[in-house]
Amino acid sequence: AQNYPKELLDIYVIADNCTDRTAQIAASAGAFVYHRYNSHQIGKGYALDFLFKRLAEEGKDDYDGYFVFDADNYVDPDFVKEMNVTFGSGDYAALTSYRNSKNFGANWISAGYGLWFLREARFLNAPRMKLGVNCAISGTGFLVTGDVIRENGGWPFHLLTEDIEFSVNCALKGQMIGYCEKAVVYDEQPITFRQSWDQRLRWSKGFYQVDY
Protein backbone atom coordinates (compact mmCIF):
# COMPACT_ATOMS: atom_id res chain seq x y z
CA ALA A 1 0.00 0.00 0.00
CA GLN A 2 1.09 3.55 -0.70
CA ASN A 3 1.03 6.53 1.66
CA TYR A 4 -0.97 8.41 -0.95
CA PRO A 5 -4.72 8.86 -1.56
CA LYS A 6 -5.79 5.61 -3.19
CA GLU A 7 -8.61 7.32 -5.06
CA LEU A 8 -5.95 9.16 -7.08
CA LEU A 9 -4.28 5.95 -8.24
CA ASP A 10 -5.42 3.32 -10.74
CA ILE A 11 -3.45 0.11 -11.12
CA TYR A 12 -3.19 -1.59 -14.51
CA VAL A 13 -1.64 -5.00 -15.05
CA ILE A 14 -0.67 -6.27 -18.49
CA ALA A 15 -0.97 -10.06 -18.54
CA ASP A 16 1.51 -10.41 -21.39
CA ASN A 17 1.50 -13.93 -22.87
CA CYS A 18 0.65 -15.19 -19.38
CA THR A 19 0.02 -18.87 -18.72
CA ASP A 20 -0.23 -18.61 -14.93
CA ARG A 21 -2.75 -17.01 -12.56
CA THR A 22 -1.31 -13.48 -12.75
CA ALA A 23 -4.46 -12.00 -14.29
CA GLN A 24 -6.84 -13.61 -11.80
CA ILE A 25 -4.75 -12.64 -8.77
CA ALA A 26 -4.30 -9.05 -9.98
CA ALA A 27 -8.00 -8.66 -10.75
CA SER A 28 -9.00 -10.03 -7.36
CA ALA A 29 -6.75 -7.39 -5.75
CA GLY A 30 -8.57 -4.61 -7.60
CA ALA A 31 -6.30 -4.01 -10.59
CA PHE A 32 -7.52 -3.38 -14.11
CA VAL A 33 -6.16 -6.30 -16.12
CA TYR A 34 -5.49 -6.30 -19.86
CA HIS A 35 -4.60 -9.53 -21.65
CA ARG A 36 -2.10 -9.51 -24.48
CA TYR A 37 -1.10 -12.51 -26.60
CA ASN A 38 1.54 -11.94 -29.25
CA SER A 39 4.34 -14.40 -29.99
CA HIS A 40 6.07 -12.11 -32.50
CA GLN A 41 6.23 -8.71 -30.81
CA ILE A 42 7.84 -9.68 -27.52
CA GLY A 43 9.08 -7.36 -24.80
CA LYS A 44 8.06 -4.71 -22.30
CA GLY A 45 7.98 -1.97 -24.93
CA TYR A 46 5.31 -3.74 -26.95
CA ALA A 47 3.28 -4.50 -23.83
CA LEU A 48 3.36 -0.85 -22.74
CA ASP A 49 2.42 0.34 -26.21
CA PHE A 50 -0.50 -2.10 -26.23
CA LEU A 51 -1.83 -0.75 -22.93
CA PHE A 52 -1.43 2.94 -23.75
CA LYS A 53 -3.19 2.50 -27.08
CA ARG A 54 -6.03 0.56 -25.49
CA LEU A 55 -6.49 3.30 -22.90
CA ALA A 56 -6.60 5.92 -25.67
CA GLU A 57 -9.18 3.88 -27.61
CA GLU A 58 -11.32 3.58 -24.48
CA GLY A 59 -11.05 7.28 -23.59
CA LYS A 60 -9.06 6.56 -20.44
CA ASP A 61 -5.84 8.33 -21.40
CA ASP A 62 -6.31 11.54 -19.41
CA TYR A 63 -3.88 10.67 -16.60
CA ASP A 64 -1.27 13.22 -15.50
CA GLY A 65 1.35 10.49 -15.45
CA TYR A 66 2.08 6.77 -15.50
CA PHE A 67 4.32 4.74 -13.21
CA VAL A 68 5.96 1.69 -14.75
CA PHE A 69 6.99 -1.34 -12.68
CA ASP A 70 8.06 -4.91 -13.32
CA ALA A 71 6.04 -7.78 -11.90
CA ASP A 72 8.70 -8.73 -9.32
CA ASN A 73 9.13 -5.24 -7.87
CA TYR A 74 8.47 -4.19 -4.29
CA VAL A 75 7.54 -0.51 -4.08
CA ASP A 76 8.41 1.50 -0.98
CA PRO A 77 5.23 2.83 0.72
CA ASP A 78 6.36 6.44 0.20
CA PHE A 79 7.29 5.94 -3.46
CA VAL A 80 4.34 7.72 -5.07
CA LYS A 81 4.33 10.51 -2.48
CA GLU A 82 8.02 11.28 -3.03
CA MET A 83 7.81 11.05 -6.82
CA ASN A 84 4.82 13.39 -6.78
CA VAL A 85 6.81 16.05 -4.91
CA THR A 86 9.40 16.17 -7.70
CA PHE A 87 6.80 15.70 -10.42
CA GLY A 88 4.84 18.67 -9.08
CA SER A 89 7.48 21.11 -10.31
CA GLY A 90 6.26 20.54 -13.86
CA ASP A 91 9.83 20.57 -15.15
CA TYR A 92 10.13 16.93 -16.18
CA ALA A 93 8.87 14.69 -18.97
CA ALA A 94 9.85 11.66 -16.89
CA LEU A 95 11.31 10.78 -13.52
CA THR A 96 13.48 7.90 -12.42
CA SER A 97 13.85 6.57 -8.88
CA TYR A 98 16.43 4.79 -6.74
CA ARG A 99 16.41 1.22 -8.03
CA ASN A 100 17.47 -0.86 -5.04
CA SER A 101 17.95 -4.64 -4.89
CA LYS A 102 15.37 -6.91 -3.31
CA ASN A 103 17.81 -9.82 -2.96
CA PHE A 104 21.14 -8.02 -2.41
CA GLY A 105 22.37 -10.62 0.08
CA ALA A 106 21.55 -13.72 -1.99
CA ASN A 107 25.10 -14.09 -3.37
CA TRP A 108 27.95 -12.16 -5.00
CA ILE A 109 26.07 -11.83 -8.29
CA SER A 110 22.98 -10.14 -6.84
CA ALA A 111 25.24 -8.03 -4.59
CA GLY A 112 27.18 -6.90 -7.66
CA TYR A 113 23.96 -5.79 -9.30
CA GLY A 114 23.00 -3.90 -6.15
CA LEU A 115 26.30 -2.00 -6.23
CA TRP A 116 25.83 -1.31 -9.94
CA PHE A 117 22.46 0.32 -9.36
CA LEU A 118 23.79 2.21 -6.31
CA ARG A 119 26.53 3.61 -8.55
CA GLU A 120 23.93 4.55 -11.17
CA ALA A 121 21.81 6.37 -8.59
CA ARG A 122 24.46 8.11 -6.48
CA PHE A 123 27.17 8.84 -9.04
CA LEU A 124 25.22 9.33 -12.26
CA ASN A 125 21.62 10.44 -11.71
CA ALA A 126 22.10 12.35 -8.44
CA PRO A 127 24.92 14.59 -9.80
CA ARG A 128 23.04 15.13 -13.05
CA MET A 129 20.00 16.23 -11.06
CA LYS A 130 22.14 18.69 -9.08
CA LEU A 131 23.63 20.10 -12.28
CA GLY A 132 20.23 20.42 -13.96
CA VAL A 133 21.04 18.08 -16.84
CA ASN A 134 19.23 14.99 -18.08
CA CYS A 135 19.09 11.82 -16.02
CA ALA A 136 18.15 8.43 -17.50
CA ILE A 137 15.43 5.95 -16.67
CA SER A 138 16.52 2.42 -15.85
CA GLY A 139 14.12 -0.35 -16.74
CA THR A 140 11.60 -0.05 -13.93
CA GLY A 141 10.38 2.27 -11.20
CA PHE A 142 9.94 5.33 -13.38
CA LEU A 143 7.25 7.91 -14.12
CA VAL A 144 6.30 9.26 -17.55
CA THR A 145 3.94 12.19 -18.00
CA GLY A 146 0.65 11.66 -19.77
CA ASP A 147 1.58 14.46 -22.18
CA VAL A 148 4.63 12.50 -23.36
CA ILE A 149 2.58 9.35 -23.90
CA ARG A 150 -0.07 11.24 -25.86
CA GLU A 151 2.58 13.09 -27.89
CA ASN A 152 4.20 9.78 -28.88
CA GLY A 153 0.89 8.07 -29.57
CA GLY A 154 1.74 5.37 -27.05
CA TRP A 155 5.14 3.83 -26.35
CA PRO A 156 7.03 3.49 -29.67
CA PHE A 157 10.23 2.24 -28.04
CA HIS A 158 10.84 -1.41 -28.83
CA LEU A 159 14.59 -2.01 -28.78
CA LEU A 160 16.11 -4.48 -26.32
CA THR A 161 16.96 -1.52 -24.08
CA GLU A 162 13.78 0.50 -24.55
CA ASP A 163 14.59 2.49 -21.40
CA ILE A 164 17.79 3.86 -22.95
CA GLU A 165 15.99 4.39 -26.26
CA PHE A 166 13.38 6.50 -24.46
CA SER A 167 16.03 8.43 -22.51
CA VAL A 168 17.92 9.29 -25.71
CA ASN A 169 14.67 10.29 -27.41
CA CYS A 170 13.91 12.71 -24.56
CA ALA A 171 17.40 14.20 -24.77
CA LEU A 172 17.09 14.75 -28.53
CA LYS A 173 13.74 16.48 -28.04
CA GLY A 174 14.99 18.65 -25.19
CA GLN A 175 12.68 16.94 -22.70
CA MET A 176 14.07 16.66 -19.18
CA ILE A 177 14.28 13.44 -17.15
CA GLY A 178 14.63 14.00 -13.42
CA TYR A 179 15.69 11.79 -10.50
CA CYS A 180 13.96 11.33 -7.14
CA GLU A 181 16.38 9.79 -4.64
CA LYS A 182 13.77 9.41 -1.89
CA ALA A 183 11.55 7.22 -4.08
CA VAL A 184 12.80 3.64 -3.79
CA VAL A 185 11.80 0.55 -5.75
CA TYR A 186 13.22 -2.88 -4.93
CA ASP A 187 14.04 -5.05 -7.92
CA GLU A 188 14.95 -8.75 -7.96
CA GLN A 189 18.39 -9.43 -9.45
CA PRO A 190 19.87 -12.53 -11.14
CA ILE A 191 21.53 -15.06 -8.84
CA THR A 192 23.24 -17.35 -11.36
CA PHE A 193 26.06 -16.59 -13.76
CA ARG A 194 23.97 -17.80 -16.70
CA GLN A 195 21.09 -15.45 -15.84
CA SER A 196 23.50 -12.55 -15.51
CA TRP A 197 25.32 -13.44 -18.74
CA ASP A 198 22.08 -13.61 -20.75
CA GLN A 199 20.84 -10.31 -19.31
CA ARG A 200 24.13 -8.48 -19.88
CA LEU A 201 24.32 -9.83 -23.43
CA ARG A 202 20.78 -8.56 -24.07
CA TRP A 203 21.72 -5.16 -22.66
CA SER A 204 24.85 -5.03 -24.82
CA LYS A 205 22.82 -5.78 -27.94
CA GLY A 206 20.33 -3.11 -26.88
CA PHE A 207 23.08 -0.50 -26.43
CA TYR A 208 24.30 -1.30 -29.93
CA GLN A 209 20.77 -0.93 -31.31
CA VAL A 210 20.41 2.51 -29.71
CA ASP A 211 23.80 3.63 -31.06
CA TYR A 212 22.94 2.34 -34.52
Question: What does each model-identified segment do?
Answer:
Residues 1-8:
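Short, acidic, metal-binding catalytic loop of nucleotide-sugar glycosyltransferases
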Residues 15-23, 38-40, 74:
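A conserved acidic beta->alpha catalytic loop
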Residues 21, 69-86:
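Acidic donor-binding/catalytic loop of UDP-sugar-dependent glycosyltransferases
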Residues 181-196:
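Active-site donor/metal-binding and catalytic loop motifs
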Residues 63, 71-73, 162:
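Short acidic donor-binding/metal-coordinating loop in glycosyltransferase active sites
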Residues 132, 158, 167-185:
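Catalytic donor-sugar/metal-binding loop of nucleotide-sugar-dependent glycosyltransferases
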Residues 66:
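Short aromatic/hydrophobic "clamp" motif used to bind/position activated sugar donors
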